[in-house]
Swiss-Prot record:
Species annotation: Mycobacterium tuberculosis (strain ATCC 25618 / H37Rv)
Stated name of the protein: Putative monooxygenase Rv1533
Cofactor: FMN
The UniProt record lists the keyword Oxidoreductase: yes
Annotated InterPro entries: Aldolase_TIM (IPR013785), NMO (IPR004136)
CDD domains (alphabetical): NPD_like
Amino acids binding FMN: Q190, G195, G224, W243, C244, G245, S246
EC number, UniProt record: 1.13.12.-
Length: 375
């Protein structure tokens, strides 16, 4: 599976694994793939610790870091707002809605210690993500990825000065062209099937459109990819690698809350929904009572980023804490970002096994396809 992407990344396989869990990142890189740590909610101190740990456990294997750089968000015109400012901008009606929701589902309050351990928020403004970039570039990362918008020129220049590749996620060919114009090295064409922030165009349609739009810039396919057959399809569409996220959420290494992991394992591909209820921007997640409550006609519209995250971060902590108790009604609310491929996630495996199974099925699939054209 030697492609330009594999060569650029220095990985054996062009399989990129996006995860917020350092253990998954390290395991995938050690298995020949390319682990990418999602750092948007990390403090600089925590990111320093996580990257140090990854490097100690990968023996020089390549890995990357993903940050969230949206061009539009509340407070962007003033260079961003901090967590306290975001909380002060939350309308009282939204607070009341969430408080009532938690009461109806029997969610207890968290302790101050639990709340402080989860503090952080989304670092999406320059003053929020620059300290994270300082930490990242002080380590031996191979790639920095930008989600929700073209990377700023200073980021591209800084990355290239450190011999670090720049990737950016795109949900349309138009987005991809803007990324290419910004000087990125890799473009991730992410279809609507994907978990997390997505657009409305399906992977099968999007990938060839993006490949044609940005050639010769290499493209990775994302959205609905968890098996070797899907990797073969992605490469047939013109991609030179894949970007996967959902498939790692049910691995042994994943930090996914047990209740949510069980829900993923039982879900079908029809059990996800694009909702603004967690971040304020459309993101695909598991459909649960949480998303249904926000979709009710009498519910308030979710707030823009980062206010929605500021509103629901503490309630989400409380829900996950309560959902672990047997028979808790909180289990109905528990959700997390995941793509439609969740319907294929039916057992817990190690991240290494996932990578090797992908490669084996890819080889078998390509062999079968070659047989179709032999005369």
């Amino acid at each position: 599976m030697r492609t330009r992407v594999a060569e650029l990344l220095g990985a054996e396989f062009p399989i990129c694994a996006f995860s917020h869990c350092r253990d998954v990142v390290a395991a995938v890189s050690n298995a020949g793939g390319f682990g990418i740590l999602g750092a948007v909610a990390h403090s600089p101190k925590r990111l320093e610790s996580e990257l140090t740990w990854i490097e100690e456990h990968t023996g020089g294997k390549p890995y990357g870091v993903d940050v969230l750089l949206p061009p539009k968000y509340i407070g962007a015109e003033q260079g961003g707002i901090d967590a306290q400012q975001a909380r002060e901008l939350i309308p009282e009606g939204h607070r009341t809605f969430v408080d009532d929701l938690l009461v109806r589902y029997g969610i207890p309050a968290v302790t101050d210690r639990q709340r402080s351990s989860s503090a952080g928020g989304l670092h999406i403004s320059p003053k929020g993500y620059q300290p994270l970039l300082d930490v990242a570039f002080a380590h031996d990362i191979r790639l920095i990825a930008s989600a929700l918008g073209p990377p700023p020129p200073d980021l591209v220049e800084r990355a290239h000065n450190h011999d670090v590749l720049v990737a950016a996620l795109a949900g349309t060919a138009q987005h991809a062209r803007r990324h290419a114009a910004a000087g990125v090295d890799l473009i991730v064409a992410q279809g609507t099937e994907a978990g997390g922030h997505t657009g409305e165009v399906a992977t099968m349609v999007l990938v060839p459109e993006v490949v044609d739009a940005v050639s010769p810039t290499p493209v990775l396919a994302a959205g609905g990819i968890a098996r070797g057959r899907q990797i073969a399809a992605a490469l047939a569409l013109g991609a030179e690698g894949v970007w996967c996220g959902s498939v790692w959420l049910t691995t042994e290494e994943a930090e996914t809350p047990p209740v949510v992991k069980d829900k993923f394992l039982a879900a079908t591909s029809s059990d996800t929904v694009r909702s603004r209820s967690l971040t304020g921007k459309p993101a695909r997640m598991l459909r649960t009572a949480w998303t249904d409550e926000w979709d009710r006609p009498d519910s308030p519209d979710p707030l823009g980023m980062p206010l929605q995250s500021a509103l629901v971060s503490d309630p989400q902590l409380r829900i996950n804490q309560a959902a672990g108790q047997p028979g808790a009604k909180a289990r109905e609310l528990a959700t997390y970002f995941v793509g439609q491929v969740v319907g294929s996630l039916d057992r817990v495996r190690s991240a290494r096994s996932v990578v090797l199974d992908m490669v084996e099925e890819f080889i078998d699939t390509v062999g079968q396809l070659q047989g179709l054209v032999q005369r």
